[in-house]
Each structure stands twice: as C-alpha cells, then as structure tokens.
C-alpha cells in the first residue's frame, strides 16, 4: 500500500485546510469513465472542450435526459470535474476559447479502478510476477557486487522501491477488487435462490465453479513464484546485515517481505472462505431438493393454486391431541416395593455405558481402515454394524459411527459438489447419503 512519512494528524489537517471533497453521482461517474476511455484512444492524451461536450451528450442520451439545455449542463459537469480535481484545464492567450483538458492523477486512479482493475487474470498476474522476479534478480546481483551508497540507491533501492513495491501494491489492489467481486456474486446467488431455486441451480453451480477456479488458478500462480521471490529478497538482506548506512535498504526489504506474505496468505484465506460458502450453498440446495425429491407435491400444489377459480378446493388440516391433555390428573402414584430380579431383557443399561462401548468398538474398527489406507464406505460400514444391534439402538450407533469416521478424515468428492446416492443401511427404510472417506488427517 501507499507509504508516507506524514502522520495521521498532519494528513487530516492538510485535507481540512484545502477543503478536499469528492462528490460523484452516477451520472458524473459515467461521464468521468467515458472521458477516460476516450482519452485512452487518443495518442496525445489531450481533449478539447468540444470533445467533452460530445461525450456528455452521449451520457445525457443514455440517462434519458433532455437535450434542450445540453450545453449548459455539459459546462456545469466539466466545471465540477475541474473543481474536484478530476480534470486539469489549460488555456492561454494563444488558445483563447479553446481550452485543453487532461485527466489528473485522481481522475486516472478512479477511472482505472472501475475499468482496468477489473481485468485481473492469471496471465496478467504471471506477467507482473515475471517483471518482479527480473527486477529482484538484478537487484540481488547488484547487492552482492557491493559499492558506495550511490550504487545501492540506484541499483538496489530504486528498482525495489519504484518497481517491485508498486507491482506488489497493484496485486494487493487487484485482490481487493476480487473480494468485492465475490460479494457481488454472493448477492447474485442469493437473489437467484430467492426467486426460483429450482431454475437457479445450474446458474449457481456455474458461478460457484467459475469463482473457485479463478481463485485457485491465481493462488497457484502466486505460490509458484512466492518462494523464489522470498529467496531473492533474503539474498539482498544477507548483504546489508550489519551495515548501518544501508538501514534504508534493510527496512525496504522487510516491508516487501511482509507485503508478499500478506498477498499469498490472503489469497489462500480467500479460497478457504469461498470453499465454506460453496459448501453452505450446496447444503441449502441439497436440503431443498431432499424436502421434495420428485417435486411432485410442489408441482401439484402450484397447479392447484393456479387453477383454483376453475376448480375450487378445500384444505383440511389435522392436529393430534397432545398426550398431556389425555392424562388423568387423579391417578395416584404406586408406592409398593417391587421385590425380586428383573429379566435380563428389562434390566437398565445407562446411555453413557452404551456410548462408551460403541465408541471403543467403532474406533478399533475404523482405525484399521486408516492403517491400511483404505477408503471408508460409510453406507457399507453402517449396514454391517447395525445388523448387530436392535432397532432401538440404530440411531445412536449410526450417529457414533459417522462422528468417529468424520474425525479420521474427509471425502475429496465433497469438494467437487457431486451428490452421493442414497443407500439403505437397514431393513426398516433408513438411508444414508455420503461419499467415501479417502483422505485421512
């Protein structure tokens, strides 16, 4: 990011004294972007007032505004951009009435953010990292050669400060643009699922997969170059250790290392966060599908509502009477002592003891899979183990098996977004939907 020697109070006072302010409506921003694009197409980078009026006329038409006062409104818009330092106006006695306009650094920066920064791609990142690698390579060779302070400032400090650091800042800014892009994609997915989730599934899958692929491709590019860049920076750092007169170079190296670490770290964190969001969306879609697998009820209900006036119908609801209302409040407790021994089938067995027995048995069973590096087919394991327990214990046993298996590892197919098939695990209609666990922790 931008480095400055000024403190926060100094910058605040400076801004207040000069009364800096930015106020760009949608129309004014569109006008500025149109000027920037037009300016890029010109070789000299200079524009006449007539050019700006023509551009404003196009903006006015796009916003469906009246053309009666086009000249006055264009003049006001140009003056506003000049006043807010988006444009510089040049005029002299030789060009009276023919002012020349050029975009200011502020105007270029804002328009660049909205136009060129969104063209972030793996190819652009590769080119940037290649330039950085060449600059750092030359700087490290110059550092190992050694020389006076002028040599260090010209051949080491200058390339790192004005080339490498600026490219790192550009990559950092591009990552922040991608963060904003992810938020817009999330909003688009939420809107699709809110309107019609059945029709939106394909679109959501495409958006999720495309974003995941872009993030991984860019992060792979960063990881491939990151270690080499850090090694070159360490070479330069070794050359300046212990030399107090080169403290400015050492400080710059430290800042560059921190920037590079931050870029790579946030890239990986962004992938992890997106994977979590991807799973959340898939879980929502899967739950919605499971609630009405064949969509028979939803389609029939939608059809009935649509044709209600042609074929009226009644909706009957039933609510079971609560058991508490059926209790006889006058019953008295029986306090007679029960003597003798209970049959073994009726003896009490605590849930904690049962849980410990099942956990110990399942740990022994599942660890054997990990030692042999064999995938765990949960549906098959559940079916084999539930056969040894009564039906009343099936739920607790299945929950313990799944909990122990998930602790051992995960299924790579979960990351692909593919849905596993439902498979029966007992003879009473219980089914499970799970991929094979094939990657152990």
From Swiss-Prot:
Please name the CDD domains in this protein's record: MukF_C, MukF_N
> What organism does this protein naturally occur in?
Pasteurella multocida (strain Pm70)
Q: SUPFAM superfamilies under this entry? A: MukF C-terminal domain-like (SSF140570), Winged helix' DNA-binding domain (SSF46785)
Subunit and partners: Interacts, and probably forms a ternary complex, with MukE and MukB via its C-terminal region. The complex formation is stimulated by calcium or magnesium. It is required for an interaction between MukE and MukB.
The domain of life is Bacteria
What InterPro entries does the annotation carry?
A: Chromosome_partition_MukF, MukF_C, MukF_C_sf, MukF_M, MukF_M_sp, MukF_WHTH, WH-like_DNA-bd_sf, WH_DNA-bd_sf
Q: Which Pfam families match?
A: KicB, MukF_C, MukF_M
The protein here is known as Chromosome partition protein MukF
Q: Which GO terms describe its biological process?
A: cell division; chromosome condensation; chromosome segregation; DNA replication
Q: Name one GO cellular component term.
A: cytoplasm
Return the HAMAP family for the record: MukF (MF_01803)
Task: Give the chief site where it resides.
Answer: cytoplasm
Q: Which Cys pairs does UniProt list as disulfide-bonded?
A: none
Keywords associated with the record: Calcium, Cell cycle, Cell division, Chromosome partition, Cytoplasm, DNA condensation
Q: What does this protein do?
A: Involved in chromosome condensation, segregation and cell cycle progression. May participate in facilitating chromosome segregation by condensation DNA from both sides of a centrally located replisome during cell division. Not required for mini-F plasmid partitioning. Probably acts via its interaction with MukB and MukE. Overexpression results in anucleate cells. It has a calcium binding activity.
Entry keyword Calcium: yes
- Annotated region Leucine-zipper: the residues are 208-236
Q: Name one GO molecular function term.
A: calcium ion binding
Similarity field: Belongs to the MukF family.
Q: Where in the cell is it found?
A: Cytoplasm, Nucleoid
